[in-house]
């Protein structure tokens, strides 16, 4: 658990897992579903979440997230879709590279894929559906909450993220 580790500040995407640490949200962040245009030309573009079951989805094992299940929300309706594919990793950069190479659809943080979406190397799919948030948090042990160096660093991060946009 984070609370047992010796660290000053940890950066985390998504909800903090441990109530024994201080978590400050430093930036909003969405997860997006995207694929290379070549993949979508070959396999078609999913129109509904259930269509994902017939696609190659690139799996990313992260923390306690349910592996192989993607949660998508439109309005008040949330669907949990069991996805599958030949490729999975615990490294988000590798997963994005596989998507860029046309191997399937990936769910990844907007900060990781924004430049590829802008350039057209990736295309967002099911854009009308929301995925679970992956807001960016600075996490630090309670014993550091009064440390000036920790406060200064976390304030710096929050200011930096506030003046940046995903992919820049």
Describe these PLM feature segments.
Residues 34-35, 90, 108, 157:
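A conserved hydrophobic position in a structured secondary element of the catalytic/binding core
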Residues 8-12, 104-108, 124:
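Paired acidic/hydrophobic, glycine-rich loop segments that form the ligand-binding mouth/hinge
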Residues 1-89:
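Acidic, Gly/Pro-rich loop/turn segments at junctions of secondary structure
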């Amino acid at each position: 658990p984070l609370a047992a580790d010796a660290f000053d500040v940890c950066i985390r995407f998504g909800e903090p897992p441990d109530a024994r640490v201080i978590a400050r949200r430093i930036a909003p962040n969405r997860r997006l579903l995207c694929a290379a245009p070549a993949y979508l030309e070959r396999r078609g573009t999913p129109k509904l979440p259930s269509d994902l079951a017939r696609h190659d989805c690139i799996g990313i094992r992260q923390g306690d997230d349910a592996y192989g299940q993607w949660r998508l929300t439109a309005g008040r309706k949330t669907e949990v879709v069991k996805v599958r594919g030949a490729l999975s990793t615990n490294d988000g950069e590798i997963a994005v590279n596989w998507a860029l190479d046309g191997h399937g659809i990936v769910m990844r943080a907007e900060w990781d894929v924004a430049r590829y979406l802008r350039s057209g190397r990736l295309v967002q799919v099911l854009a009308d559906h929301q995925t679970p948030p992956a807001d960016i948090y600075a996490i630090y042990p309670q014993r550091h909450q009064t440390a000036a160096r920790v406060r200064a660093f976390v304030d710096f991060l929050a200011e930096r993220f506030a003046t940046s946009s995903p992919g820049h």
